[in-house]
Amino acid sequence: MHTLAKSEDPAVEKGAPWGLARISHRDSLTFGTFNKYLYSSDGGEGVDVYVIDTGTNVDHVDFEGRASWGKTIPSGDEDKDGNGHGTHCSGTVAGKKYGVAKKAHVKAVKVLRSNGSGSMSDVVKGVEYAAESHIEQVEKAKKGKRKGFKGSAANMSLGGGKSALLDQAVNAAVDAGIHFAVAAGNDNADSCRYSPAAAEKAVTVGASTLADERAYFSNFGKCNDIFAPGLNILSTWIGSETATNVISGTSMASPHIAGLLAYLLSLQPSKNSAYAVAEITPKKLKADLLSIATVGALEDVPSDTANVSNSIFPCFRSVLTQIRSSPGTVVVLPTTPRSSPPVATRSRTRSASTVLRISRLSPRPTLPTRPTRRSRRWMLRSSVRT
């Protein structure tokens, strides 16, 4: 890692969504910090982020022209996000106001139709497209046709029953050099029973709340790598170039991590390698991400789940020094939950359905005691509050 090019002092976004504030403060948020995001103004520069979802409202002003359409996978569908889910995730990754990595470039990969449904084969094709596109960009950079390219990250805020095919596709994309974040799922269950949450080479992300608790719906277990803000998240939306919406889910947590991966990748020195222009591999950056995360900050985390959340020091010199000296691993002591739901111990077979659908938890003024049990279908990992 290297120090910041322009200044060691972070920029401060006032009036930021609470999720951005949380990832830039080690301690719990206070009245004075709950809406302040500390960041590098160059964060994400030179990095492509593939948002594999329902598409992206690429004309939204918050993207400042940094969002483009990659590919529409479903046959006969339009190059447009008619749902909003993908646009919301993209905004959290790279929006000027709502995003973690404010200079990253979003590439929309539409794998689900506007109603949120689609085939598992289309999702796999979307992952394969992202990997192939990344490899093409690496070759362009090595030939001097794309200067400043640092590499690629990806976000996948969808999932369903265990699918070896999808897990293999995601792991292969990571092997190709993409730094991948995936949602853990919203079933309040063991994330190892779902895909792509079980893809071991990706970063699997659970959802946390403003009160530093595991979100009541968030999956948990040994396949979880980290938690990130996922309840009542404000970001970009469809319908106009300025539309916004507040929604919840591990869908919202995962793009915080995808954005942070892009952010950290952009701080790497440019150097050709088998993975990307930045030499660091996805495996090493994942280890670095975990090494600078906060351990033991969350309540209601089952004892078999890593109590790790993506909060970092606002002092960027400290962060970069930690990454330089990181051994690449992190030891996490199990935390006894204050009042967490029991960890599932009974094995249950789930068929990997070929249909993906949106998972919408009922809008509510207060949190229910437990989420609605979902059928064996693939789904987007969000709920909508309008």
Where are these regions (language model features)?
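Substrate-binding/access-modulating region of protease and related hydrolase catalytic domains
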Residues: 43-44, 96, 111-201, 211-216, ...
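Autoinhibitory propeptides
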Residues: 1-20
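Cationic, amphipathic, low-complexity alpha-helical segments enriched
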Residues: 312, 319-323, 329-386
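Structural recognition of the beta-strand scaffold that forms the well-ordered cores
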Residues: 48-52, 105-110, 152-157, 179-183, ...
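Hydrolase catalytic cores
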Residues: 90-93, 105-113, 128, 216, ...
